[in-house]
Amino acid sequence: MARYKDSTCRLCRREGTKLFLKGDRCYSDKCAVARRSYPPGQHGQGRKKVSEYGLQLREKQKVRRIYGILERQFRNYFEKAERQKGVTGENLLILLERRLDNVVYRLGFADSRAEARTLVRHGHFLVNGRKVNIPSYLVRPGDTISVREKSKASPKFKEIAEAAAHRNVPAWLKADSSTLEGHVLALPTREQIDTPAQEHLIVELYSR
């Protein structure tokens, strides 16, 4: 699948907020947004009046980039959210949170969603005891996500286990860093999703 190849820090600066695309670096003084809180490029520091459509588009791009999803797939998630009962914008965020790569990241088993996506693709994770190497796989309440026994012995996952012990996990998940195993306790509520999103703007954009 095609992916954005330019600097991920430029994406954060373009959106004017931290997208947490580079793991621990995003929490440090090295974060590009902390050092240069204006868009990249020659005219980045110039002030522009943004139209209503521009605000909606930027919000969609921001959320899409946070979860590392291309436009067609993001549109598919929106259409699925629209068909579900409830608030479309909230349904959209819940679907994105249920992605296996996001859950691996939320459990603390990867520094970033991009790293989680790579680890899932390489077959390091099991869902209910079966290998799943599809990052977009949607987890359900009651699912158990674990690291393959063979992978646990690698230096990489020993580092992950050590780091995971100090990471906060959202209330809808439960993680055990000693066994590198996590459980989906429930679907997340909107209040439990800390993604900096104004999802109503995305709904307005796609409703045009």
From Swiss-Prot:
GO biological process terms, semicolon-separated: ribosomal small subunit biogenesis; translation
Annotated disulfide bonds: none
Domain S4 RNA-binding: 98-164
Gene3D superfamilies: Ribosomal Protein S4 Delta 41, Chain A, domain 1, RNA-binding S4 domain
Gene Ontology molecular functions: rRNA binding; structural constituent of ribosome
Keyword Lipid biosynthesis among record annotations: no
Keywords: Ribonucleoprotein, Ribosomal protein, RNA-binding, rRNA-binding
Stored InterPro entries: Ribosomal_uS4, Ribosomal_uS4_bac-type, Ribosomal_uS4_CS, Ribosomal_uS4_N, S4_RNA-bd, S4_RNA-bd_sf
Alphabetized CDD domains for the sequence: S4
Ribonucleoprotein as UniProt keyword: yes
Gene Ontology cellular component terms for the protein in this record: small ribosomal subunit
Task performed by this protein: One of the primary rRNA binding proteins, it binds directly to 16S rRNA where it nucleates assembly of the body of the 30S subunit. With S5 and S12 plays an important role in translational accuracy.
Family per record: Belongs to the universal ribosomal protein uS4 family.
Complex formation: Part of the 30S ribosomal subunit. Contacts protein S5. The interaction surface between S4 and S5 is involved in control of translational fidelity.
Name this polypeptide is given: Small ribosomal subunit protein uS4
Annotated gene: rpsD
